[in-house]
Swiss-Prot record:
<comment type="similarity">
    <text>Belongs to the metallothionein superfamily. Type 15 family.</text>
</comment>
<dbReference type="InterPro" id="IPR000347">
    <property type="entry name" value="Metalthion_15p"/>
</dbReference>
<dbReference type="Pfam" id="PF01439">
    <property type="entry name" value="Metallothio_2"/>
</dbReference>
<keyword id="KW-0480">Metal-thiolate cluster</keyword>
<dbReference type="GO" id="GO:0046872">
    <property type="term" value="F:metal ion binding"/>
</dbReference>
<comment type="function">
    <text>Metallothioneins have a high content of cysteine residues that bind various heavy metals.</text>
</comment>
<keyword id="KW-0479">Metal-binding</keyword>
<protein>
    <recommendedName>
        <fullName>Metallothionein-like protein 1</fullName>
    </recommendedName>
</protein>
Length: 75
């Protein structure tokens, strides 16, 4: 399950909870501006009802937990 707490959440210079994929960072140097291809796998079909459970989460606030993950994931 992915958690995106929004751009307003950060904890420290190395951890930004608002990043959807924190491992994929932008590089500023000219050598690093090489085109990259990211191949995403195939996921099984979602069953009806799974989305509703995830969409039911609500609330404000976020804090960074272990390994720079949003904690809790209820943003």
């Amino acid at each position: 399950m992915s958690c995106n707490c929004g751009s307003g959440c950060s904890c420290g210079s190395d951890c930004k909870c608002g990043k959807m994929y924190p491992d994929l960072t932008e590089q500023g140097s000219a050598a690093a501006q090489v085109a990259a291809v990211v191949v995403l796998g195939v996921a099984p079909e979602n069953k009806a009802g799974q989305f509703e459970v995830a969409a039911g989460q609500s609330g404000e606030g976020c804090s960074c937990g272990d390994n720079c993950k949003c904690n809790p994931c209820n943003c």
